[in-house]
Amino acid sequence: MKQWFEEEDFWINYAPIMFDDARWAEAPDVAEYVKSIANLKDGDSVLDAGCGLGRISVELAALNLKVTGVDIIQSELDAAAESAAAEGVELELINADLRTFSSSKKFDCAVNLYTSFGYCATEEEDLIIIKNIFDSLKDGGTFILECVSRETAIMYFT
């Protein structure tokens, strides 16, 4: 049985609410911040784990980074590809479950942003995701994990 976050219909219905105009407008600043705090240089590689619609992936690519986005929902990846094409940037997009994701490619930085973590039914599954992301990093690579507190979620989503 699929978990709720694996259901494509959920994301099709929820995405317009979760990713309103304000969320899209902040994406360039978020990407700049990621590049800055991870000390990334042009041409460095970034894994966007749980990239969804590509909101941040596209902006990171626009900053001359090589971006690979991974998501479990194919329609989200299709939307990310459309956004990348519209902005004239390249993304590598992979349809995969982060619980089983593995890459022979190693990244300078990995990000998991904006409520893309903590969906799994068990802590063990969440830890597997963290390990898989960590294992995808080059030695000395940076992992940026954004977690939303209960208070923040209540403020934004109620």
What are these model-derived regions, one by one?
Residues 45, 140-142:
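Short glycine-centered segments of the SAM/dcSAM-binding site in methyltransferase folds
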